[in-house]
């Protein structure tokens, strides 16, 4: 964009060309023209304390938040101090000590003496009207040169740096709970640089005690990135500045006649704009790179070319010297171990970026900025209110005086990058473990001695920066031997047991459908059940057991490896199900072979008999492979029920046999290839003589196919109506005892829930503009009076618990005019759940929890020999 005023800076419109100095070349690349560079720095500099992450934005307009202070707008002709200091850093303090040509430096320095509009710069008093700006002319001396890192560490100037002239006292006005100290209103104190007393302490820098660590590639990476981090100390909002520079450079096209000297200078500026996160990605990409990439002439793309979309992109950059260590005999297994443990590619797009370019249909996607940069602002306290910004993906708190982080950081579950380096932290809050999407966690140069076990939840971690802390030697050993992911897995697998305070309570429901009494266990409730209630009621369980083929270490990285093993989970499932001792057991996600070899023989020993139906894809496979396909199964106690009818159905097959079947485009393209199934049983309750119908199913999982789920339920309910009418044409189908349970993969707000609860789907977005023939024309309507079992006490907090999804998707529906709920298994203890980011774990062997209820038959003549079509309720 040529007009700077269009980028959120109205006082900086296009300027008339300035006369060029005689000694300058007639043509300069745009990135090297002094006036243009000054405009660029003012233009793209985000507001203080904020760095935005709107995708695809290069203007900085739509995704910037202006606090009214330090915005970069010139006030009364006063130039922006941020621009001068940043330009000074870019010219004189480049990281590779490869200076910009002296002629160019002189020209840029001369330009720095002029305001943006070409008017003469006022003296210090002219800044009095520039509210929130610090005109400390000596502040620039507090900045650490972006040069040789050894100078930084050897001269003990890494920690406790003073304020910069860029740090206005009101820099974060409008930000919740930011506490800073300053000498006067509108200014931060600029104390002298204090030496870092721990710079030569081997407890903080173990390579000083054990020089062999210098040959360890993991520790070399720690030192390399700790050096990069140290270079930013004392430079307020360093991430925001670097991001602004990258966005500017991405818009520039080098001229064709660019000299080598000019190209070198431009490359130098691009190098300066690289952040710690960029350097981390560069290093990790090098570790993950193929060995023969150099031979093929391959090199990773330049960072600047891959970071134009947003501040949360994952660019790749050129290789570093660690690639050479791959050839050393002592390092290949270590480097490859990181690759093996990571199980994902460093350069794959962030999930959040994919959401940003997708249709904006959520509150999260309407948010246009996702990062806050509070680096090097002399902040000594962070209010928990900051943690209410749960949409944040990046939070930079490095270079302050923080001694603690609020436990409410657990709310930032979208966080990808967290920089806590160069503070005074003695521990990390265990709640950071809830930020399971963290990829880059930095806490260089603090006072941390150990890591909370909860960090084992950080299953997506790609780098953990810990150098400069007196960290426990055992943890350091694991880090240097097994890399970052190995350390996380160690914390995950060796976490002490979290006590389970109590079993899920069983809630007794009275005849009016209201909770009456709570029992500590299902067994206790059973012991207190009256003999009359036992004769006219039954219990049933519905449980998605998580098929072992889906429970892979890659999918469930947050679960300890021993707790994820099928042997352990199978025994836990067995223990749970047998302890519940229900009259009916319905299971989903059961492998065919597991049913035959484990569940069927086990439950037959305990007085059950059952039926299994695999998903339809098993029909297309050879016998051996078909045994690995999962499906649904239903068991009943032979002492309680007698089976009168059974049927295994698949939804596509039912619809194709329907008398009103239509081959619509949506059916053919969206529903026909889904292989979900259901089991239907007609059972007679032996003690009461009542007849009931039992259905268990597992609907399609993908939320992009909610219309297909509605279609599947519509087919199922239509089929049940047909069966009920065939069995007894004179009886109202509403008065048949019917229970439908399973994993419906549908929210409470879904069209599936609406269809079950109201009998039709009316103008619901899930099925909008979809054509499933007869069902769509009739709004999928049915005449069954169904009610969710948990409706009388309120649906549970969740039935499926994973880091990325926690909600109710499992249900037990019953015919409310023929059955009455008399008891329900309650929710999992919320305090216990707060210690985890998902199931399975050592106590819960599936990512779903079981649903359990007791159901009473209402008085009726609904017996096997009944011909009556009516009864009173």
Curated annotation (Swiss-Prot):
One of its GO terms (biological process) is nuclear-transcribed mRNA poly(A) tail shortening. LRR repeats lie at residues 391-412, 414-435, 437-459, 460-480. It comes from the Eukaryota. Residues 319-332 have a biased composition (Polar residues). It catalyses: Exonucleolytic cleavage of poly(A) to 5'-AMP. Keywords: Cytoplasm, Exonuclease, Hydrolase, Leucine-rich repeat, Magnesium, Metal-binding, Nuclease, Nucleus, Repeat, RNA-binding, Transcription, Transcription regulation. GO terms for cellular component: CCR4-NOT core complex; Cdc73/Paf1 complex; P-body. Pfam families: Exo_endo_phos, LRR_8. Residues 14-29, 299-318 have a biased composition (Low complexity). Mg(2+) binds at residue 589. Residues 1-29, 292-332 are annotated as: Disordered. It is found in: Cytoplasm; Nucleus. SUPFAM superfamilies: DNase I-like, L domain-like. Gene3D superfamilies: Endonuclease/exonuclease/phosphatase, Ribonuclease Inhibitor. The keyword RNA-binding applies. It is an enzyme of class 3 (hydrolase). Its EC number is 3.1.13.4. InterPro entries: CCR4/nocturin_mRNA_transcr, Endo/exonu/phosph_ase_sf, Endo/exonuclease/phosphatase, Leu-rich_rpt, Leu-rich_rpt_typical-subtyp, LRR_dom_sf. Its main location: cytoplasm. Its cofactor is Mg(2+). Belongs to the CCR4/nocturin family. Acts as a catalytic component of the CCR4-NOT core complex, which in the nucleus seems to be a general transcription factor, and in the cytoplasm the major mRNA deadenylase involved in mRNA turnover. Ccr4 has 3'-5' RNase activity with a strong preference for polyadenylated substrates and also low exonuclease activity towards single-stranded DNA. This is CCR4-Not complex 3'-5'-exoribonuclease subunit Ccr4. It comes from Candida glabrata (strain ATCC 2001 / BCRC 20586 / JCM 3761 / NBRC 0622 / NRRL Y-65 / CBS 138) (Yeast). The gene is CCR4.
């Amino acid at each position: 964009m040529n007009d700077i005023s269009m980028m959120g800076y109205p006082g900086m419109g296009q300027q008339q060309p300035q006369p060029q100095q005689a000694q300058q070349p007639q043509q300069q690349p745009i990135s090297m023209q002094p006036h243009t560079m000054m405009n660029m720095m003012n233009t793209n500099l985000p507001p203080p304390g904020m760095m935005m992450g709107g995708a695809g934005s290069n203007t900085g307009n739509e995704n910037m938040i202006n606090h009214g202070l330090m915005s970069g707008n010139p006030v009364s002709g006063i130039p922006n101090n941020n621009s001068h200091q940043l330009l000074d850093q870019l010219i004189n303090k480049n990281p590779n000590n490869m200076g910009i040509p002296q002629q160019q430096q002189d020209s840029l320095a001369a330009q720095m003496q002029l305001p943006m509009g070409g008017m003469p710069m006022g003296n210090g008093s002219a800044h009095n009207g520039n509210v929130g700006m610090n005109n400390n002319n000596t502040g620039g001396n507090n900045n650490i040169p972006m040069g040789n890192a050894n100078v930084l560490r050897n001269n003990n100037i890494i920690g406790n740096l003073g304020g910069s002239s860029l740090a206005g006292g009101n820099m974060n006005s409008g930000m919740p709970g930011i506490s800073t100290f300053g000498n006067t209103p509108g200014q931060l104190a600029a104390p002298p640089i204090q030496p870092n007393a721990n710079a030569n302490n081997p407890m903080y820098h173990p390579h000083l005690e054990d020089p062999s660590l210098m040959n360890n590639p993991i520790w070399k990476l720690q030192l390399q990135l700790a050096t990069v981090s140290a270079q930013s100390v004392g430079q307020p909002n360093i991430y925001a500045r670097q991001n602004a520079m990258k966005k500017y450079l991405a818009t520039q096209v080098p001229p064709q006649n660019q000299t080598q000297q000019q190209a070198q200078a431009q490359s130098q500026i691009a190098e300066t704009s690289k952040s710690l996160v960029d350097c981390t990605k560069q290093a990790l990409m090098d570790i993950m790179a193929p060995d023969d990439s150099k031979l093929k002439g391959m090199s990773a793309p330049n960072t600047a070319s891959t970071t134009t979309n947003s501040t949360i992109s994952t660019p790749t950059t050129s290789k570093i010297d660690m690639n050479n260590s791959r050839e050393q005999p002592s390092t290949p297994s270590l480097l490859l171990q990181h690759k093996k443990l990571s199980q994902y590619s460093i350069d794959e797009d962030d999930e959040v970026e994919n959401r940003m370019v997708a249709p904006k249909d959520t509150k999260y996607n309407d948010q246009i900025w996702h990062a806050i940069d509070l680096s090097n602002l002399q902040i000594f306290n962070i209010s928990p209110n900051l943690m209410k910004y749960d949409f944040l993906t990046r939070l930079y708190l490095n270079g302050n005086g923080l001694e603690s982080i609020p436990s409410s950081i657990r709310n930032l579950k979208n966080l990808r990058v967290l920089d806590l380096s160069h503070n005074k932290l003695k521990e990390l809050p265990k709640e950071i473990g809830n930020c399971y999407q963290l990829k880059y966690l930095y806490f260089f140069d603090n006072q941390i001695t150990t890591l909370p076990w909860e960090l084992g939840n950080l299953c997506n971690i790609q780098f953990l920066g810990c150098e400069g802390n007196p960290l426990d030697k055992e943890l350091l050993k694991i880090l240097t031997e097994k890399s970052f992911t190995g350390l996380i897995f160690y914390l995950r697998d060796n976490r002490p047991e979290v006590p389970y305070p109590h079993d899920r309570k069983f809630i007794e429901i009275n005849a009016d459908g209201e909770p009456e009494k709570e029992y500590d266990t299902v067994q206790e409730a059973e012991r207190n059940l009256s003999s009359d209630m036992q004769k006219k009621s039954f219990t049933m369980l519905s449980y998605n057991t998580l098929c072992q083929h889906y429970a892979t270490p890659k999918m469930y990285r947050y679960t300890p490896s021993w707790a994820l093993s099928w042997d352990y989970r199978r025994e836990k499932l067995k223990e749970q199900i047998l302890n519940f001792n229900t009259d009916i057991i319905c299971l989903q996600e059961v492998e065919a072979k597991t049913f035959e070899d484990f569940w069927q023989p086990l439950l037959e020993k305990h007085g059950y008999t059952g039926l299994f139906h695999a998903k339809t894809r098993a029909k297309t496979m050879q016998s051996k492979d078909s045994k690995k396909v999962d499906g649904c199964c239903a068991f009943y106690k032979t002492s309680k029920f007698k089976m009168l009818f059974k049927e295994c159905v698949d939804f596509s097959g039912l619809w194709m046999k329907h008398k009103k079947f239509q081959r619509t485009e949506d059916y053919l393209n969206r529903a026909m290839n889904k292989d979900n199934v259901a089991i239907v049983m007609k059972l007679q309750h032996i003690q009461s003589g009542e007849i009931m119908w039992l259905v268990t199913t597992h609907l399609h999982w993908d939320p992009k196919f909610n219309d297909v789920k509605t279609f599947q339920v519509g087919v199922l309910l239509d089929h049940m109506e047909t069966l009920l009418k065939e069995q007894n044409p004179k009886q109202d189908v509403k008065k048949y005892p019917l229970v439908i349970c399973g994993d419906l993969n549908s929210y409470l707000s879904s069209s599936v829930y609406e269809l079950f609860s109201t009998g039709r789907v009316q103008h619901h977005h899930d099925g909008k503009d979809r054509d499933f023939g007869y069902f769509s024309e009739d709004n999928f309507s049915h005449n069954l009076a169904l009610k969710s079992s948990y409706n009388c006490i309120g649906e549970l907090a969740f039935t499926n618990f994973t880091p990325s999804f926690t909600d109710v998707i499992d249900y037990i529906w019953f015919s409310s005019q023929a059955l009455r709920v008399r008891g329900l298994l309650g929710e999992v203890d919320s305090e216990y759940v707060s210690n985890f980011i998902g199931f399975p774990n050592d106590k819960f062997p599936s990512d779903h929890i079981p649903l359990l209820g007791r159901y009473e038959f209402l008085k009726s003549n609904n017996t096997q020999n009944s011909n009556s079509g009516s009864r009173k309720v």
